[in-house]
């Protein structure tokens, strides 16, 4: 079989949507053993928490474009319509946190489903390489905000090949 779809259409309130999406990601991805201060911690759940809260909090609800969580063999990907403040990749070292829906952001922080504004980007950059050695999240802000999280080492190599600089680009970058 070339394709397997386990689709989930979520049309409920934000709290239930959060729980349903977290369960969906847990169902289709493996959890790896990791200790934080001698306590077993689910890195998968830490990553999922940031991904799910991002698509719920930063969504542009005036658009009919459906938010998506896509789990592939090697990747977790999201697509979410948003009002971009800038275009292109969001890097850990050069981004300015900006809540697209500040009331929702404060609510998610108050009920414990998110941390402070901007912590999601930092946490994705922190936990993705722990979950997938050598992996880095890819966050792309355009009209459709995309997050790509590698979940296998194959995805890490695939990403490196796709984003490898040419000799000319390397020379220009070093200038």
What are the residue ranges of the model-derived segments?
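C-terminal regulatory or interaction extensions
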Residues: 1-175
